[in-house]
Swiss-Prot record:
<dbReference type="Pfam" id="PF00154">
    <property type="entry name" value="RecA"/>
</dbReference>
<dbReference type="InterPro" id="IPR003593">
    <property type="entry name" value="AAA+_ATPase"/>
</dbReference>
<dbReference type="InterPro" id="IPR049428">
    <property type="entry name" value="RecA-like_N"/>
</dbReference>
<dbReference type="GO" id="GO:0006281">
    <property type="term" value="P:DNA repair"/>
</dbReference>
<dbReference type="InterPro" id="IPR020584">
    <property type="entry name" value="DNA_recomb/repair_RecA_CS"/>
</dbReference>
<dbReference type="GO" id="GO:0003684">
    <property type="term" value="F:damaged DNA binding"/>
</dbReference>
<comment type="function">
    <text>Can catalyze the hydrolysis of ATP in the presence of single-stranded DNA, the ATP-dependent uptake of single-stranded DNA by duplex DNA, and the ATP-dependent hybridization of homologous single-stranded DNAs. It interacts with LexA causing its activation and leading to its autocatalytic cleavage.</text>
</comment>
<dbReference type="InterPro" id="IPR023400">
    <property type="entry name" value="RecA_C_sf"/>
</dbReference>
<dbReference type="InterPro" id="IPR049261">
    <property type="entry name" value="RecA-like_C"/>
</dbReference>
<keyword id="KW-0238">DNA-binding</keyword>
<keyword id="KW-0233">DNA recombination</keyword>
<keyword id="KW-0234">DNA repair</keyword>
<dbReference type="Pfam" id="PF21096">
    <property type="entry name" value="RecA_C"/>
</dbReference>
<keyword id="KW-0227">DNA damage</keyword>
<dbReference type="GO" id="GO:0009432">
    <property type="term" value="P:SOS response"/>
</dbReference>
<dbReference type="InterPro" id="IPR020587">
    <property type="entry name" value="RecA_monomer-monomer_interface"/>
</dbReference>
<feature type="binding site">
    <location>
        <begin position="78"/>
        <end position="85"/>
    </location>
    <ligand>
        <name>ATP</name>
    </ligand>
</feature>
Amino acid sequence: MATTGLFEMNDKGKADKQKALECALAQIERQFGKGSIMKLGGDTPPPEIEATSTGSLGLDIALGIGGLPKGRIVEIYGPESSGKTTLTLHCIAEEQKKGGVCAFVDAEHALDPYYAKKLGVSLEDLLISQPDTGEQALEIVDTLVRSGAVSLVVVDSVAALTPKAEIEGDMGDATVGAQARLMSQAMRKLTASIGRSNCMVIFINQIRMKIGVMFGSPETTSGGNALKFYASVRLDIRRTGAIKDRDEVIGNQTRVKVVKNKVAPPFREVEFDILYGEGISKVGELVDLGVKAGVVAKSGAWYSYGDERIGQGRENAKQFLRDNPDIAYEIEDKIRASHGLEFGVDPTAEDLTEE
């Protein structure tokens, strides 16, 4: 009898809690509007995270979802001339192929439109702004994101976002922490609107050295710590060597490490070639990743795909794939399938052209 009474009390307590919860939810919806709170696994499950390709197949695979996540903040940092802007221009070109509107906030006033065009960027459809102050730059970013019509915004770079107080002051005046405060406020304002509009914002950043560090890495990024916390993905890009044609340097060997990733496992690394005037070498990646995935067979110096030999040496194999885009697409499709990825857009013959 006592046990029955205890169960009845428990049931009554649960019913009271459920009633209180329903009242609280109803009050929240009255105050903030329908959809302001809901069950995560309800009638409308959360949508899958969309991704924009980086232009590098290896990096798309390393990021785990086939590219950089939409509706998130991304930070790309590294030393000078390591390929940061090149990588973001490839992202813009890939997003434009899908019909998205892209904007480039050029705080460094250093964008080369001819180079951007060579990487596949449609200059007619690219919005560009060259702001005078950091406040102006971030206000422009906020307005573009809130419009809901822009898919991708690139800020180049955080280090060049100079606070108004610093510009109006004299050379040598101390404005300690002004840039960090500016970035911290911008992150707080941007985060919610970025999520609602499903717009990706990429911040390019530079490396600085911390003074007096005895242990650990002395490197840090400019603009304070706010961006590190708010970014869903952080990429560390480095130049590891030079690519030579006889005695002439024609490009860089580049390594990218996924330092932070909120949408897939982090700390993956990938290497690819960046050729001067051409960008990321797609056919070079197909050869290297094809061998790793077992799609392309390598015996001595010879590369073969199925029963067909595609070249003796890496350069000859690359040339074969340039001349035979259909086979290149087959290889790419199989590499993507082996990692659970699919083509985002139908590729064109121009994607493999490297002059």
